[in-house]
């Protein structure tokens, strides 16, 4: 009978026939399958010791590869461990637990287990069965001193709400206040193969919209005027479609592809309306005046001061654009990042020369004095201090070099005018590489 048991292949034995080598001290043995590949024995032992295991015997080959026999002292520990470990996800694997022994003949069970041990090269690893594991399994309270007298639920799962502006703002504040949390977030981004955040700010993906928010948007769109209804309805529909497909950049995205090419719609973290580029709408006003007789017209013409006419003309002709006009004419930062012409934009090293491109075809030299004149005391000082070199032919057409009297003035002008829409095209301004690239205009 013993020779027949040792010659029988170990893989053909059902799992329910395995019993512990020493039934009296161990009591109950469980067979745990689907362990992670290549996991060390000490990690397996520490894992099962938390559930009250007294000994762990991993298997190394055959049908019981990635499996282990776990011994328990009594039926209570084994039943609780079977209930908690079965279906547990451990390092990407779902554990499968079943009983490995039943009250059969001890002699037969020992012969079967010895044959399996020889065929699969079992290695027995004993663990320390201290009092802590028994206390945890028996339901130790979480914090009795604080009034929490119930044990920690083993099957607790969390259901987090979707992100919104307040949640993201609180997370940002926590990252600033707790430096270890910031380091752990960077570690997690590295493990998930996300693009590194050490660069300029990228467009923010749209936040998921809830049901009440969509109804509010529909109510707002219905209350708008008839002249803007077509455009607003088109933008709202496109916004909903993009929000439906707009996901955060994750594992499925190539790391070499920049975010700008993905087509993520820029949005703001603060709960406000979607920013739109303001369009100047020209409204034609027709004034209808009553007919005036010749005598009345003469009296009015005599009362008018002839010196008022040149004053009105002078008030309409401004020597240079004001700071408010430049600020209103600039594109918002989120719109600048979304334009392909600003892809990989860098300001460069500060110098007295500004390199400007993406200019309209009908731009002339006087336009630069009008745009940058606010940096000088008067238009005469601007024409004498600002050197302009406008390229109007060849491959450099639509580009210009401006020479300022100092680096501070050039830096202030770049921050003020970069992205300013002039004659239908946004200006792209960078620092020039060589100070001698631009010469004063004679």
From Swiss-Prot:
Top-rank taxon of the source lineage equals Eukaryota
Basic and acidic residues composition bias: which ranges?
102-116
The terms under GO molecular function for this entry are:
pre-mRNA intronic binding; U12 snRNA binding
Q: Which GO biological process entries does UniProt record here?
A: inflorescence development; mRNA splicing, via spliceosome
Q: Which SMART domains match?
A: RRM (SM00360)
Q: Where in the cell is it found?
A: Nucleus
- What phenotype is described for loss of this gene? Lethal when homozygous.
Which tissue types show expression of this protein?
Answer: Ubiquitous.
Q: Where is the composition biased (Polar residues)?
A: 117-136
For the region Disordered, what residue ranges are annotated? Answer: 101-138, 200-242, 290-317
Principal localization reads nucleus
What does the UniProt record say this protein does?
A: Component of minor spliceosome required for U12-type intron splicing and alternative splicing of many introns. Binds specifically to U12 snRNA, which is necessary for branch-point site recognition. Required for normal plant development.
Report the protein name in the record. Answer: U11/U12 small nuclear ribonucleoprotein 65 kDa protein
- Organism equals Arabidopsis thaliana (Mouse-ear cress)
What's the name of its gene? SNRNP65
């Amino acid at each position: 009978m013993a020779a027949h048991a040792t010659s029988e292949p170990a893989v053909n034995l059902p799992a329910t026939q395995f019993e512990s080598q020493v039934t009296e001290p161990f009591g109950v043995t469980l067979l745990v399958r689907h362990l992670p590949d290549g996991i060390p024995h000490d990690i397996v032992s520490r894992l099962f010791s938390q559930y009250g295991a007294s000994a762990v015997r991993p298997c190394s080959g055959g049908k019981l590869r990635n499996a282990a026999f776990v011994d328990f002292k009594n039926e209570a520990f084994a039943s609780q461990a079977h209930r908690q470990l079965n279906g547990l996800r451990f390092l990407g694997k779902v554990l499968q637990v079943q009983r490995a022994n039943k009250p059969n003949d001890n002699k037969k069970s020992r012969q079967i287990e010895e044959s399996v041990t020889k065929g699969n090269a079992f290695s027995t690893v004993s663990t320390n069965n201290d009092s802590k594991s028994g206390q945890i399994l028996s339901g130790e309270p979480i914090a009795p001193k604080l009034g929490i007298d119930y044990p920690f639920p083993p099957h607790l799962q969390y259901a987090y709400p979707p992100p919104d502006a307040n949640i993201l703002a609180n997370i940002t504040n926590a990252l600033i206040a707790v430096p270890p949390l910031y380091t752990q977030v960077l570690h997690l981004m590295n493990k998930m193969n996300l693009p590194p955040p050490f660069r300029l700010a990228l467009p923010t993906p749209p936040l998921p919209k809830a049901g009440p928010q969509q109804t509010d948007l529909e109510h707002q769109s219905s209350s708008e005027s008839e002249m803007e209804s077509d455009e607003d309805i088109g933008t709202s529909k496109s916004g909903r479609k993009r929000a439906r497909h707009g996901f955060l950049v994750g594992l499925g995205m190539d790391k070499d592809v920049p975010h700008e090419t993905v087509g993520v719609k820029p949005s703001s973290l603060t709960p406000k309306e979607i920013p739109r580029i303001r369009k100047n709408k020209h409204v034609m006003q027709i004034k209808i005046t009553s007919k005036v007789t010749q005598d009345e017209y003469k009296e009015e013409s005599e009362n008018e001061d002839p010196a008022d006419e040149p004053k009105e003309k002078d008030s309409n002709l401004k020597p240079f654009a004001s700071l408010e006009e430049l600020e209103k004419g600039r594109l918002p930062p989120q719109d600048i990042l979304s334009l392909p012409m600003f892809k990989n934009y860098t300001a460069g090293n500060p110098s007295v020369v500004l390199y400007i491109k993406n200019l309209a075809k009908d731009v002339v030299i006087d336009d630069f004095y009008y745009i940058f004149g606010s940096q000088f005391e008067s238009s005469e000082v601007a024409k004498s201090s600002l050197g302009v070199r406008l390229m109007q032919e060849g491959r450099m057409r639509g580009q210009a070099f401006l020479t300022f009297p100092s680096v501070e003035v050039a830096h202030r002008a770049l921050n003020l005018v970069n992205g300013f829409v002039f004659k239908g095209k946004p200006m792209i301004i960078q620092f020039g590489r060589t100070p001698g690239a631009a010469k004063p205009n004679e």
